[in-house]
Structures are given as structure tokens and as C-alpha cells.
Amino acid sequence: MRRLTAVAVLTLLSAACSHMEMIEEEFSPPPAPENGMQIQLKEVQGLQPGTSYEYCTWTDQITTTELSVKAMEGFQTKIGHPVTMFYTTKMQPPGTTRECTEMDMASFRFAGGSAGEGAESVVPGNLVYKIPKGVQLVVNHHYLNATQNVLTGKSALNIRFADPGTPQVTAGHLAYVNTELRIPVGKASMDILCTMKRDEKVWRMLPHMHRWGQTTRIDVVLGGQSQRLFDLPWQDDFTFHPPEKTWPIEQPLLMKAGDQVKVHCEWDNTTDKPMTFGMEMCVAFGNTINAEERENIACDNGEWVEF
């Protein structure tokens, strides 16, 4: 998508920086799961107040067989938001870490992720996230520093595999977003309209905004009939733990090509500068039953792209 890795960097004057305090946090993630592995990332220092950064780290994990992932559990310092795993065939030296670029992200395929607060994200039933043989695992670690201090970001990710020999169906991902988001100082709103380009079987949907969010609504229009999934006054804890709506995998939400998804977001930007995508967001995420093993897709301001 055009700018899923967009960041809003609100730089403060260097004179002001001289009065800021550097804060260090303890970071002790639990050990790797018995049937899985752990990826620990190099810390990122000097994260400035009022900034959002997205880093990509190419790990030393290059798959020698296809992996079937059942769950991921992310761990980050308090400004982490979130930690996400991708894979790529365009390999870099292990440990390469830099702010993610559009060119980088265009070479990645989404594998899964976690909010980064130690909450395990598990796919239900016999669903798994598939990672092919012969690819390099890449971790995207996002840091949102809404404090008045210079901070260090640290991240780790535990990956739990499905039990071998069990029946498996691939889980997929959807996103509805506008990465050209720009929020002026004060109150603002945005509407996103997406028309489905293919049939999907959805088992989970959830909204996503950051701390300046006020309200979000998500509607689906199925066969011409509108159904409201969310109508929420936003709360601070929703940033990391949003409400979600789920359907049994035996009876998923059936979305047909031509159906629509409507997302409405409202904010109150109490800072003194406009915000762009990264510092704030307006997103609806969906998880699908992807037995056909098709590419994940996202609707970015009405334009469908693979990710």
C-alpha cells in the first residue's frame, strides 16, 4: 500500500531537547515457547518526544521448511506499538535495522503480529499463519513516543508453532485504511469507503486508532443491507487492546465482491502540530479463512493492494 509504513515525525527544537530527560526501562521478556522460537531485537535509542518511528530488522532466521504459526506474543517497552512479523525473499545481512521504507515494505509479505504488551495473539480452530520455505523473517517494530522524554525502544517476539500432524487451514488478513491521513490541530474526522474486490470469509474484525481518537464506527454493507459492527467512544486502552467482533470459523461473516466496508473516525488533536499516518491512524482490520492461500489485501483509500 502506498504508505502503510508512513510515520509522523514531529521534531522539537534542539534548544528544548537540552532540557529533556533520557529514560531507561527494564525489559525482560519471558523465554521462548517450547514449540517455537524467540526473536529479540537490538534496542533503538534516542526516540524523541512527540514522534512515531517504524523500524525494520532483518533477522538471522531464514526458513529451511514451511512454518505453520499458531500464535505470536510481542513484548516491548511502554512506547512500543506494535511488533509485527513479515517475511521476504530480498534478503539483507542479519541484524540490519533501519527505519522502514516503502521500497522495503513492497518486498515484504505479512506473517502476523502482536500488540506488544505480552498478550498472545492466537488463531482459532485449525487456522494457522503460513510462512514459506526459503525466506528471511523481518520484524517491524513501531514506537510511538507521546511522552516529554527521550526514550529507548526495545522489542521481542515469541512465535509458537502449530502442533505437527494436526489439520491446518491458512488464516489471512484484511485492512481498510487511508495512509494519506492528515489531522489538523483540533477536532477532525475521516471517512473511508471500500468496495470488496473478492469474496472473503471473515472470523474477526477490530478498529484501530491512537490516543487522540474520540469515536470510531465501522459498517458493512452486505447484499445492499447495512450492518453496524462498531460504534464506539474511543478509550486510551483501546490503542493496545481494542474491542473486537468475532464469528465462529464454522459460520464466518461472508463478504462478497461488491459488498462495502465503511470506516468513520473522529479525533481531537490536542497537540500544537498536525498529525499524519503513524502518529494517529484510522484502520479496520480483518482476519479471514484463507483456504485458497491467496495474498493478503488492503484497501488504502479505495485502492486495493497486496501485503
Go through each PLM region and give its residues.
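Sec-dependent signal peptide recognition
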Residues: 2-8
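C-terminal motif of bacterial Sec signal peptides marking the signal peptidase cleavage site
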Residues: 14-16
